[in-house]
Amino acid sequence: MKPIALLFALLLPTLASAGVYDDMLNALRAGDTPAAVALLNRGVDVNTVDVEGNTLVMLAVRENNAELLDQLLLRRARLNVRNRNGDTALRLAAFDGKLPFVQRLVEAGAEVNMYGWSPLSYAAFNGHAPVVDYLLRRGAEIDAKTENGSTALMFAARNGHLAVVESLLKAQADPNIANESGETALDWAGKGNNSDIVQRLRAAGGVSGKAAAPSK
């Protein structure tokens, strides 16, 4: 076989596979679950990623496709892969408050605790109390810190999510942890002009970072 013909023959499987993967991503984004499942049955790698590093599991979460997510879980798709933004599928589900997806992922073995922004922090940031409660029941570290030392309680306090603040305090979140800037949840609540949360934190023993030693 001539070199050019040989090279073309070697490339054919790669080109075909790339086309099949594109079909899979397109079917998922279009919500065409039967087509996506058919492609999985043809052997599409369940751990395929798009150009941004999003896995099929992440895309199923983003597109609210629980049926396809279940198919991917049955095929043991990897759950703790991070995309280019450093997010996992569970983080994305928690950020959007998609409790059924959060439950499916955790029950399938997705990591609840991780370095940096945790799924709990994501859920607290956006005020998704049911997701916060579920993650706490499943072992989420309540006082886990982001890279700058901020906690889920701080995010909920800053953004005015009283129900989440209540859940976290009931679960014994520490209101006096200070981040790298020396600020506590009380300081963050004040910045957000959330007077009801300021009162609740004070009732729980919360103080300003001026009185609380920075947490190490």
Predicted features and spans:
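Conserved ankyrin/ankyrin-like repeat signature
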Residues: 35, 67-68, 100-101, 130-131, ...
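Ankyrin repeat boundary/linker residues
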Residues: 50, 83, 113-116, 146, ...
